[in-house]
A protein has these predicted regions:
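Conserved AMP-binding A3 loop
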Residues: 1-16
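Nucleotide-sugar-dependent glycosyltransferase donor-binding/catalytic pocket residues
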Residues: 2, 42, 175
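Short beta-strand->loop structural element characteristic of the AMP-binding/adenylate-forming
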Residues: 5-7, 36, 58-65, 134
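Short aromatic/basic micro-patch
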Residues: 7, 85, 173
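Conserved AMP-binding/adenylation subdomain of ANL enzymes
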Residues: 14-33, 43-82, 97
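Short acidic capping loops at alpha-helix termini that bridge into adjacent secondary structure
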Residues: 29-33, 106-108, 169
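Gly/Ser/Thr-rich phosphate-binding loop
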Residues: 54-57, 78-86, 92-165, 178, ...
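Conserved beta-loop-beta connector loops within the AMP-binding
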Residues: 173-194
Length: 194
């Protein structure tokens, strides 16, 4: 279909940049090496091209082999990537490569998963590599990050079943984002879990 045009204000871009750097969001800092495995034209690579220079983080661009497991593992290891963002299929390809090759990604600390629901199995497999998985909801019209789930920091507060259920949702709205649920007539619905 036709591409959609979305206008961003300087203010929304700056606020979004600061929000993505917060600990319960993408937690980007000057200590990070970030590999955004999302195209620049897709919701601004989830804001990473703005957050990295503001934080003083190094940003590694993956080139045209964004979903190729061996290439990603090589980039992560050669560049010392600490944080990366991508859709579930990217992570499935990386994990399949790691599983079949026995290769490790020692520097990778966290991945942000968005674009579609992240399977619990992906999160659990990343756990075996010591990588924190953060589920997020992004949308072009939102500058783009809307919610982030950094539940791993609270893992010790829950039993395994409750933690598994909690970590597969998309989390809470980030700073500056307001959300509501409406019916078909745009009437706001109660926050009652139904």
């Amino acid at each position: 279909g036709n591409p959609k045009g979305v206008l961003y204000s300087h203010r929304s871009t700056v606020l979004h940049t600061y929000a993505t750097m917060m600990p319960d969001s993408m937690n980007i800092s000057s200590a990070d090496v970030v590999l955004p495995i999302v195209p620049m034209f897709h919701v601004n690579a989830w804001g990473n091209p703005y957050a990295c220079p503001v934080a003083g983080a190094k940003m590694v661009m993956p080139g045209n082999k964004m979903g190729d497991g061996p290439t990603l593992a090589t980039l992560i290891n050669e560049e010392g990537v600490t944080m990366s963002a991508g859709v579930p299929t990217v992570w499935l390809n990386l994990l399949a490569h790691l599983r079949s090759s026995g290769e490790r990604v020692e520097t990778l600390q966290r991945v942000v998963v968005g674009g579609s629901a992240c399977p619990l199995s992906v999160m659990e497999e990343f756990d075996t590599y010591g990588v924190d998985t953060r589920h997020a909801w992004v949308m072009t019209e939102m500058s783009p990050l809307g919610t982030s789930n950094s539940s791993g920091a609270r893992r010790h507060q829950y039993d395994a079943y409750s933690f598994a259920a909690m970590r597969t949702n998309v989390g809470q709205p980030i700073f500056g984002v307001e959300v509501k649920i409406t019916d078909d007539d745009n009437n706001e619905l109660p926050w009652d879990g139904v």
